[in-house]
């Protein structure tokens, strides 16, 4: 099996916690060939979507962790699976990449997650499709509506629609301190749409990342507990990860969403759940594989590659494409 990973620069990888690295390591352990490219290398030429793909061999060393082979210009149809693992922001370059990947799909490439499904599921807005699991929420750039929402709820989280890692998230309490400044800053004076949600006190127990793989939930979540004085549990914002079994409510949410999202072409999804409420549906490059595995022994990457084998094999009727 030949797998192409579309990734950020390898120099940015922190392999002790990187989920893409965990995928690569599991694939390599099964004898699969690993190739990488960057988003900027995707090209449509002569109506064929191709990229400069670099073969990668993992060394097992913590620092000098890979050896690169000679880069080759190859069509995406030459791989058994193409994994889009580029981190947000989900900007127009990201959208353009999904268009190119969708063309490659029509040419026979097998791309995960499905490019159209990535576009169709804004990581913040997708929760609106599952309203029975969400806290009170408003999405607008109208300052008056945002102020009214705050007056109704009393304690509100404001966040941009295109952020990641907890960037740009603000809490405004019942006293309304800095409400105007937060609204002006996040909406860029009314020119950008934002989300506001009722503050959920259960954030003190962690923002739970629940992974859905191939239509099934991983049995353990990673509760990302905020550091003192913070409302953001994101690991990138200083939160601490604590693996735990899915609660009864977690399972209800996960089992309701997993088959629906898988049917839409989303092989890997990261749900964010605070207390009893779904807050985000992450579809670009969900993470937390290694933290869950290290704390529980459950092989998340193994479950993912198992699902990838089934998905790629089902799409092709068998594995083993030959590169030109």
Swiss-Prot record:
The protein's enzyme class: ligase
PANTHER family: GLUTATHIONE SYNTHETASE, RIBOSOMAL PROTEIN S6 MODIFICATION PROTEIN
ATP-grasp domain span: 124-309
Entry annotated with the keyword ATP-binding: yes
InterPro entries assigned to the protein according to its UniProt record, in alphabetical order: ATP-grasp (IPR011761), ATP_grasp_subdomain_1 (IPR013815), Glut_synth_pro (IPR006284), GSHS_ATP-bd (IPR004218), GSHS_N (IPR004215), PreATP-grasp_dom_sf (IPR016185)
Protein residues bound to ATP: 150-206
Family: Belongs to the prokaryotic GSH synthase family.
Record-linked HAMAP family: GSH_S
Any single Gene Ontology cellular-component annotation: cytoplasm
A Pfam family it matches: GSH-S_ATP
Biological pathway: Sulfur metabolism; glutathione biosynthesis; glutathione from L-cysteine and L-glutamate: step 2/2
PROSITE patterns attached to this UniProt entry: ATP_GRASP
Catalytic activity field: gamma-L-glutamyl-L-cysteine + glycine + ATP = glutathione + ADP + phosphate + H(+)
Binding residue positions for Mg(2+): 280, 282
E.C. number(s) listed in UniProt: 6.3.2.3
Cofactor (UniProt): Mg(2+); Mn(2+)
Cofactor detail note: Binds 1 Mg(2+) or Mn(2+) ion per subunit.
Protein name, as recorded: Glutathione synthetase
GO molecular function: ATP binding; glutathione synthase activity; metal ion binding
Keywords: ATP-binding, Glutathione biosynthesis, Ligase, Magnesium, Manganese, Metal-binding, Nucleotide-binding
Gene3D superfamilies xrefs: 3.40.50.20, ATP-grasp fold, A domain, ATP-grasp fold, B domain
């Amino acid at each position: 099996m030949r797998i192409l990973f579309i990734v950020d620069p390898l120099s940015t990888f922190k392999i002790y916690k990187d989920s893409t690295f965990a995928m690569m390591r599991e694939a390599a352990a099964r004898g699969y060939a690993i190739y990488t490219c960057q988003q900027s290398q995707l090209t449509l030429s002569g109506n064929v979507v191709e990229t400069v793909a670099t073969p990668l061999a993992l060394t097992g060393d913590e620092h000098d962790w890979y050896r690169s082979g000679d880069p080759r210009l190859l069509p995406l149809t030459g791989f058994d699976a193409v994994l889009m693992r580029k981190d947000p922001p989900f900007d127009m370059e990201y959208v353009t990449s999904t268009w190119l990947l969708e063309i490659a799909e029509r040419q026979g490439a097998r791309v995960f997650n499905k490019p159209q499904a990535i576009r169709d599921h804004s990581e913040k807005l997708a929760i609106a499709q599952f309203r029975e699991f969400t806290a009170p929420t408003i999405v607008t750039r109208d300052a008056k509506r945002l102020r009214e929402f705050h007056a109704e709820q009393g304690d509100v989280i404001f966040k941009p629609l295109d952020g990641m890692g907890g960037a740009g998230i603000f809490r405004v309490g019942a006293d309304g301190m800095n409400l105007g400044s937060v609204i002006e800053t996040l909406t860029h004076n009314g020119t950008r749409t934002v989300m506001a949600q009722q503050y959920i006190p259960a954030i003190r127990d962690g923002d739970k990342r629940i992974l859905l793989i191939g239509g099934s939930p991983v049995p353990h979540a990673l509760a990302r507990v905020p550091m003192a004085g913070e409302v953001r549990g994101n690991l990138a914002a200083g939160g601490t990860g604590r693996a735990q079994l899915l609660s009864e409510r977690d399972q209800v949410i996960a089992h309701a969403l997993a088959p629906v999202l898988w049917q839409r072409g989303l092989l890997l999804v990261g749900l964010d759940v605070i207390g009893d409420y779904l807050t985000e549906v992450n579809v670009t490059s969900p993470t937390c594989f290694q933290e869950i595995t290290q704390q529980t022994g459950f092989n998340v990457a193994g479950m993912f590659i198992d699902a990838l084998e089934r998905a790629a094999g089902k799409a092709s009727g068998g594995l083993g494409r030959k590169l030109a």
